[in-house]
């Protein structure tokens, strides 16, 4: 029986479901794993991916299903909930199913968006551990990342304070001539802290560091998090952590973590992060959690490692991409799958009637405020105008050769005529379409959805990339802008174009993937523009270089790597029951 999600908070549903949650050793038996492949951590466990992959290397892969969404409202449209609901629906159909979601950042958890654990009866458990650090991967990434900044700033201080002779005699340290105006990396923390976007460090005497402008980003924007999502194994992690560009010297040459001799220590912090954490849904379907990069400012994917394990362990493996199809799906398609070599079968387009009404010209949706009545009452005119956004994303998925399935993530305010209108346009655009009530009913409410996905998986995928790596950077950006965003073209600031030309002329960057940095709230660079706008140009103001991840990141519009905390954050409603020690108020 599903829980009454209209009367119970998510954390209350999680508490009830946790009473019968399998232990790590029960999971070992249920999943047919060997004892040495389970790494217990309290009531959770990690999976030793090398041991599992070595044992299952000859087993055929299962069906590979990606979950994305239409351009969302600021509230999000329920991709995590839909991913969990699909696992539960497939489980109700008796198939061997599992999946992988990203680890949530503490910033959104304590801010507006919540935990990304799903919701209602389509929920990952245990919710407290999921929301409050899980098995420590983000903390390990923060330590490794900030250690690189410690190495850099200490080196700058010592090079200023000591002569060449003293440096050689004391430490055998060669002078790197670091340019304090060209420090790329910055510091990170796992909260939305707008006060730390621009800071001055090193204030004090000569022993108090090197005084310069610096910055903080949110932990999930770190290149190290992106690296975790794409690495193949521990040697690959070690190699990439030694190649990160931290700064540039006064001649314009990169200063790397290898130059600072810190890559090995960074790997020591992250050695355990390469193993995914095993959790489950409220209906006890297995789901891994691994990596957590945002999609608008990073790659937005759970890990290749977890997908490789899942495709060996399960007949159907579900993975989620961040934000909408123009952001997360595009990176799944052209970045993640290029690195992994895996061939996906189906892409689920999570769709809500409220978001389509917004794209049709509905009133502004503001987190924390009541929804205007246009969203809670039938309005076929707004809906029909906004459906173009869904159709645009269906067409994007079809360009990849994958089979699209539109999931109408049901709300109790949706009417039969509204649902029928969405279904008609989705099917006319070449997608299968299913209504799903997984939030209210769990797997039982997702049977139509599960059946549509099973049917789509029977159709052979014609997967292909949008562009070849041989294509020049500016041409790749133009291709993504035109084919995925619907832009007429691309404009470059003089500095950004000069940087792009430099990168195009250096063969070292020929095999770097292109990872766009853009708002998730619009197909354009302007978050206020909704629907499917025409006659616009994508402005590129910079190109970031992630030399460890091997990403070139063109930045469209103004994007901050450190979000801000709102005036009504979630942490105001989170507390601990001091009699039981249990956390309450998470959502």
Curated annotation (Swiss-Prot):
CDD domains linked to this entry: FTHFS
GO BP: tetrahydrofolate interconversion
One Gene Ontology term of the molecular function aspect: formate-tetrahydrofolate ligase activity
Pathway: One-carbon metabolism; tetrahydrofolate interconversion
Catalytic function, reaction form: (6S)-5,6,7,8-tetrahydrofolate + formate + ATP = (6R)-10-formyltetrahydrofolate + ADP + phosphate
Keyword field: ATP-binding, Ligase, Nucleotide-binding, One-carbon metabolism
Name of protein: Formate--tetrahydrofolate ligase
Organism lineage: Bacteria, Pseudomonadati, Thermodesulfobacteriota, Syntrophobacteria, Syntrophobacterales
Gene that this polypeptide is encoded by: fhs
